[in-house]
Amino acid sequence: MANILKALGRSRAGIDIPPVVVIGLGRFGSSLAHELMANGVEVLGIDSSEKRVREEAPYLTETIAADTTDPEALRQLGVEEVERVIVAIGSHLEDSILTASNLVELGVKDIWAKADS
């Protein structure tokens, strides 16, 4: 990501990037979250696995174990207040689609989703 910012002629310090929620802390989600953190972006990491949440806790701004297929869980976390959410649930396509649908219903403005079928 830093290379992209340099290519645009901007420094990381000159760009105010709002916090990002990353849902799914597997290989892709955790790598993406680490890269965002390395570039000064605050990251809330959410995963259904408490083990993954514990493993990522030292590296992210905040981590939470939650079932994101449950719209009430997303509401309780205040996810609708964040501008950008990345859905990185790769191994369960149905969960990824349901989570993305819940985010749309909550009015999240910018949703990026990755899924493997």
Stretch-by-stretch model annotation:
Residues 1-117:
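Cytosolic regulatory regions of ion transport systems
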